Amino acid sequence: VQAMNNMDADKYEIIPLYLSKENEFYTGSRLRDINEYRDLKALISKSRRVILVNDKNKNYLVRYPLKALRKNIVSEIDVAFPIVHGTNVEDGTLQGYLKTLNLPFVGCDVFASGLGMDKYAMKIMLKEAGFPVLDCCRFSAHDYQNVDNVIAAVESKFAYPVIVKPVNLGSSIGISKADNKSGLEKA
């Protein structure tokens, strides 16, 4: 909201667009007021649900569901300025969606966004680029079907304490410290 309210409204037509956790888009003037976000359910109920549509290389916000015999195009969009946080938006998913619409957007592309959310892949890239990074190991959900093998692999490579973190959640979500085997089993 701060970024939107500080853009040059004389130069740009700024259209607020909210993406819900259910992956539904909403627009409306109330999205410009930070205080409205205190009650998301009420804010959404006071906003217009829309979808993004590309038609003949132009992008539009279109009322959803469509209304018969009514103007359904809410606005044309020239560029998206995604200011987002969380799953399906920081990881390249939103950027990929915008790319499928051929809708220009600011910020990282699909690859860079995905890489930025994948802690293991980012670590490998940084290491290959010559940056000092701590050693690590990665395990898949399939690997965890045999937890004893995972624990043995960790213990053969590292001394306790060890830090366990999900590969692709937010920067500190799900991180735990294991001081011993019992702690590692819980992590």
Locate the predicted segments by residue.
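Basic phosphate/pyrophosphate-binding loop/patch that engages nucleotide-derived ligands
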Residues: 125-133
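Acidic/histidine-enriched active-site and ligand-binding environments that engage anionic O-linkages
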Residues: 151-162
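An N-terminal domain-start capping segment
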Residues: 112, 186-187
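Structured loop/turn residues at beta-strand edges in well-structured enzyme cores
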Residues: 75, 131, 158
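Charged helix-capping and loop-helix junction motifs
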Residues: 148-153, 177, 181
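Glycine-rich phosphate-binding loop of ATP-grasp-fold ATP-dependent ligases
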Residues: 133-138, 162-186
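ATP-binding N-terminal substructure of ATP-dependent carboxylate-amine bond-forming enzymes
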Residues: 1-111, 115-121, 128, 140-152
